[in-house]
Regions:
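Acidic, metal-coordinating catalytic segment for phosphate/diphosphate chemistry
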Residues: 1-22
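Active-site-adjacent beta-strand/loop module that shapes the phosphate/pyrophosphate-binding cleft
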Residues: 81-111
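A short coil-to-beta-strand element that immediately follows conserved catalytic motifs
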Residues: 71-81
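Conserved Nudix-box catalytic region and its N-terminal flanking loop in Nudix hydrolases
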Residues: 27-67
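Nudix hydrolase/Nudix homology domain
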Residues: 41-43, 111-151
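Short, well-ordered beta-strand micro-motif
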Residues: 25, 102-106, 123
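A generic structural micro-feature
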Residues: 13-17, 92-99, 116
């Protein structure tokens, strides 16, 4: 998150537009991989913010690898999410309005290797047994995908 951290040095905690990507990674049982984040103690999808010169698919692949140890062999674009429901205020006070490109991944390789500085736990969940503590800006994404999957 170098670019955003550099901006924070100039603008402080004021709201920023933060473009990024995340990944709905599904196992063979159609369970979704979620990570328990250390910064806000909520579950969410692997993902992060765009760095200078990256495209959104590159962000999705990079963040998946960094946070989980898994390599996406194929990504399928799902949707772009933005708007007031994607506003988030981090526990330390930084505010963002997220613009998130979400990708689906069912083909991947590697073994779990969580990024110790950001991730407490990695776990697959069935869509009928999702944890209650999901990161607020990611909940609408997960619900949207669940609705598309089961309708």
């Amino acid at each position: 998150m170098g670019y955003i951290m550099d901006l924070r040095k100039v603008v402080g905690s004021r709201p920023l537009l933060m473009a990024g990507a995340n990944v709905i990674l599904l196992d063979s049982q159609k369970r979704v991989l979620l990570q328990l984040r250390k910064d806000n103690n909520t579950w969410g999808l692997p993902g992060g913010s765009l760095e200078l010169g990256e495209n959104l698919e590159e962000v999705a692949k990079r963040e998946l690898k960094e946070e989980t140890g898994l390599t996406a062999l194929k990504l399928e674009f799902f949707n772009i999410f933005s708007g007031k429901e994607f506003y988030y205020k981090y526990p330390h006070g930084d505010e963002v309005y997220n613009v998130i490109a979400t990708y689906i991944c069912t083909e991947y390789s590697g073994v779990f290797e969580k990024e110790e500085s950001e991730v407490q736990d990695l776990r697959f969940f069935s869509f009928n047994e999702l944890p209650s503590e999901i990161s607020p800006p990611e909940l609408p994404i997960i619900i949207s995908f669940k609705d598309a999957l089961f309708n």
